[in-house]
Amino acid sequence: NPVIDGSTVYAVGNNNILVAIDLRSGARIWEREIGSINQPWVAGKFMFVLSNNYDLFAIEKATGKIVWNTQIPLGKTKEDKVGVTASGPVLTSNRLLIATSNGYAFAVSPYTGKILGFITLSDGVGIPPVVVDNTALFATDDADLTAYK
């Protein structure tokens, strides 16, 4: 899903291309070799995108410069990570939230990329959390709805 912010369209695809395009002219402003099935999150001067390799990137919107990137830990061993997916990011209360299909939700600093903590959910999550009034709602695969402030 592309994101429109002002006169710029930000789009990312599974083909390892993240691109910023001028909405009026269609001219490419910048591109990076980052692929994702998740929608980028735009906030202020930055955008955040979770790559297909589960690296969370903070990128300057105007230039495409990568400010930081953090690997989201999907498991302790290679076998733990097989078939695991992640969704997000979603920004709320100065935290980027990432949910995983093996039942974890991570909070990451949007300023530094440091993982601030994680919680264990009752089951996996296949969709990004929804934020309502600074409360993050996680819908798990076993149909539990969990709210965190």
Q: Which role fits each region the language model picked out?
A:
Residues 1-4, 27-44, 69-90, 118-133:
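Extracytoplasmic beta-rich repeat domains
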Residues 1-17:
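Solenoidal tandem-repeat scaffolds enriched in leucines and small polar residues
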Residues 100, 108-149:
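Hydrophilic extracytoplasmic domains
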Residues 22-25, 60-63, 109-113, 149:
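Short loop/turn segments that connect beta-strands within beta-propeller blades
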Residues 19, 57, 106-107, 146:
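WD40 beta-propeller blade core
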